[in-house]
């Protein structure tokens, strides 16, 4: 490796990876998945040197195991169970599950294939590696760091001056500039403001005594599309039922938009409204979404002021403050803010993702509330899923 190791701890990932993986470990160990990398920035070129470094970093990642103190920390999290922690004592990333290639034009391909309980863990580690290699080898890293610090200084000043009054969690490890910069940003936001309530990064939560924050991602709902016995338009129902059975109302913030929020609300019935403490927005108009969710709570006699609206879609602090001012007297409001915390520099950040695309050989997809966010390698399946969603919505409207 030309660079120092990027991932040095298997805790250096989002909490929701462990949350989802625990459900899979207890209920769905028979599922296998395939994940595919995509860079959404037009014209992004990865050089041969970058490609070689990415592979060397993946090789290093696959030498890591959980340390005793890391397992003890996971065991201390209220809803993480002892048998799952003991499984993680045995688990490690397996290099054979990851395939990489580079086209002559510099397009990077990464595919992860394996048992879902193992394959799903690679996503955040790989995104951290790709992002840091790209920015360290493409730009003058020290110059980027100077611009990042200047911007962070202004953000902290704005919190301390009273310009921003909302609370938020840092959700930035997947697209961070570097490990060292996310560490510095989280430390300073947590110690120099009163507004940063935690982080999704389990390693940094442990290091700084912060609250680790996260529930589940789109892939958790998507995986039910690959189970033969589950109708496609009812996957939210089965996902929430398994989640509640695992966590019994703890760790209860539901993601609404995997196959559209309108369909989600058909399964977010009175029982689920009571079982989950809130919902997360990740696509579409956040104001229209919030109004729709509040009306849904009122429909079932739940006081929206007792429920959490968690916004996490491409936020900066100005957008978050506007949403907070709009909803603060009508519901609990919080924010998960990622790239704006961990990779706000003089250069445009990469918009990179690694998405679940097949489960047990069957295509799966995310629709979301923003059409451009849909990602599926099988367009026939994507259209079939859209028709299934539309049929149920029309039948039950």
Describe the role of every protein-language-model region:
Residues 1-235, 244-245, 354-397:
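Ordered alpha/beta subdomains of enzyme catalytic regions
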Residues 3, 208-397:
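Glycine-rich phosphate/ribose-binding loops and adjacent secondary-structure elements
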